Each structure stands twice: as structure tokens, then as C-alpha cells.
């Protein structure tokens, strides 16, 4: 059979079409041997290879054979059944991967927000077990400081009239970020202020309570769940908000070495995968 010849499979009543070269990508698999008529359990009926297995799960099997990637929809739970299908088709690398409980055990992120409120300032510290999440939040949080107008030291009754310049956030480590907002006074006179903006919101906020409310709302929209609140220091008015987010990897890229019958996981990418209706 030519590698460019079109092959149609009937798996449990569902039909799939692909090239014979695709099915030969894993030469030790049942699908490759099928093309050489070396498998008695797979018969040709009406010109189609008939396989008496689960057709809906075969769509994931065929996608893996085509791309060497396992793409599962969000909320997929049939890992044990899919593993049995991989074993039937003798795709050993996929079966071994599906046997690992870490594949379908959600990864838990813990994020903590510490909020210190003083008379004219509010200080924030975000800590997260995932450095990637902290990088994402650091890119979205912007801090601005008022700049003096001219060399005469003129003062303005409204701080919004002064130009604002971006100020870098503090990064004590890869897992936390520190920023602040509020008004600076010297001898009772307003001399400057710091504002905070959190993308995609366009507002520049100076009030710490408003910034806190916006920050918590954004975290909830990002899939975090608030699991606890507590006062770290009642005297200094330090409040701590602890969030949790469970994430499951949905795309795993696998480097397959068919000849040596082994594999290694190169990367694990988290991305939203939609159910594939096309076959």
C-alpha cells in the first residue's frame, strides 16, 4: 500500500479517513500492522477497516498518531478508558503517559495578597507559587508617580493636573511583586502621589481600597477562588487574602522514539482545547 493512499476506518460505527503514511508513523502499533493485513481482529468490510472499539475515543488516538500531541478538552475525565484504547492499539508511549496520575491530577496554584493600609498610603504584596502567574500579573499592574511641573515648584490644587510617569514595581523574587498607591505630604502639604492601574482596566487609582477591590475582582475572573482572609497584624492593619486555582494540563507534547520503544516528555503546554468534532 502506497504511503499516500487514503485509508478509511470504521471504528465502532464512526468513520475516519487518513493517509496510510500517518498510520505508519508508529510502525510497532496495531494500526501500522493493520495495513499489512497482519492483525486478525481488524477486518476489511465494504472497503473500510472495521475496528470494534470506541469511536469517540479513537479521535484522540488518531490525533496523537498524526501530531504526537495529546489534545484533550477541558473537563475530560475518561483517562482510564483512553489508556485501555492506547493499549489496544499498542501505542505504548501514550499508554504509559496516561497511566501517570499526575497527568489528570489538577495542579494547584496558591496566590496570596497582603494589603497594608496607612493614613495616606496603601501597600500591596502578591506572592504566588507559580512564577508564571506572577509574571503575568506584573505585566498587568502599572504604577505611576506624579512629576513636578516646571522648575518653579508650582503646586496645583488637583494632583490629576500633574503629569504621571511610570514607576517600576518591586520584585523581591520570581514569586512575588510589591507596589503601592497613595499621597505624599511634607509639612502638611501635598507634594506627590502614586497611582495604580491594572489591565485591562484603564483607570489610574489612588485609593488603596479601590485598588484592592479591582485586584480581587481580576483574580476571581482569572479563575482563582478565595479560600481564606485573615488579619496578619491588627496594629498595622495588614490583611491577607489567600486564593487557590486548580489547573489541568490539556496539551502535552511528546517526543516519540518508535524504534527504541521509549519516549520523553519535552514540554507541557497549558492551553484551552476544544472538543474536535471533525474527523
From Swiss-Prot:
Question: Which domain of life, per UniProt?
Answer: Eukaryota
Q: Which residues form the BTB domain?
A: 5-74
InterPro entries hit by this protein = BTB/POZ_dom, SKP1/BTB/POZ_sf, T1-type_BTB
SMART domains from the entry? BTB (SM00225)
Family matches, as Gene3D superfamilies:
Potassium Channel Kv1.1, Chain A
Q: What is its main location?
A: endoplasmic reticulum
Q: What are the GO cellular component annotations?
A: endoplasmic reticulum
Name any one Pfam family assigned in the record. BTB_2
Where does it reside? Endoplasmic reticulum
Is Endoplasmic reticulum among this UniProt entry's keywords? Answer: yes
* UniProt keyword annotations, A-Z: Endoplasmic reticulum
Summarize the protein's role. Answer: Inhibits potassium fluxes in cells, possibly by retaining potassium channels in the cytoplasm.
Name of protein: Putative potassium channel regulatory protein
Record organism: Xenopus tropicalis (Western clawed frog)
Amino acid at each position: 500500500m502506497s504511503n499516500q493512499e487514503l485509508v478509511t476506518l470504521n471504528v465502532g460505527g464512526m468513520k475516519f479517513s487518513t493517509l496510510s503514511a500517518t498510520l505508519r508513523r508508529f510502525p510497532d502499533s496495531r494500526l501500522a500492522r493493520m495495513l499489512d493485513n497482519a492483525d486478525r481482529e481488524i477486518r476489511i468490510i465494504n472497503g473500510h477497516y472495521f475496528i470494534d472499539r470506541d469511536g469517540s475515543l479513537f479521535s484522540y488516538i488518531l490525533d496523537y498518531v498524526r501530531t504526537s500531541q495529546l489534545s484533550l478538552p477541558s473537563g475530560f475525565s475518561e483517562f482510564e478508558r483512553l489508556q485501555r484504547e492506547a493499549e489496544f492499539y499498542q501505542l505504548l508511549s501514550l499508554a504509559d503517559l496516561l497511566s501517570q496520575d499526575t497527568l489528570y491530577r489538577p495542579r494547584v496554584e496558591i496566590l496570596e495578597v497582603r494589603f497594608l493600609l496607612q493614613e495616606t498610603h496603601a501597600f500591596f504584596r502578591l506572592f504566588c507559587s507559580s512564577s508564571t502567574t506572577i509574571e503575568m500579573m506584573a505585566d498587568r499592574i502599572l504604577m505611576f508617580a506624579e512629576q513636578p511641573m516646571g522648575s518653579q515648584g508650582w503646586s496645583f490644587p488637583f494632583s490629576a493636573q500633574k503629569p504621571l510617569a511610570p514607576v517600576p514595581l518591586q520584585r523581591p523574587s520570581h514569586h512575588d511583586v510589591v507596589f503601592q498607591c497613595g499621597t505624599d505630604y511634607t509639612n502638611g502639604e501635598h507634594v506627590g502621589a502614586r497611582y495604580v492601574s491594572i489591565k485591562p482596566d484603564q483607570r489610574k487609582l489612588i485609593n488603596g481600597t479601590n485598588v484592592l477591590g479591582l485586584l480581587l475582582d481580576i483574580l476571581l475572573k482569572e479563575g482563582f477562588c478565595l479560600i481564606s482572609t485573615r488579619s496578619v497584624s491588627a496594629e498595622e492593619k495588614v490583611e491577607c487574602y489567600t486564593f487557590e486555582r486548580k489547573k489541568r494540563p490539556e496539551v502535552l507534547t511528546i517526543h516519540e522514539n518508535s524504534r527504541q520503544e521509549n519516549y520523553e516528555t519535552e514540554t507541557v503546554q497549558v492551553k484551552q482545547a476544544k472538543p474536535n468534532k471533525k474527523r
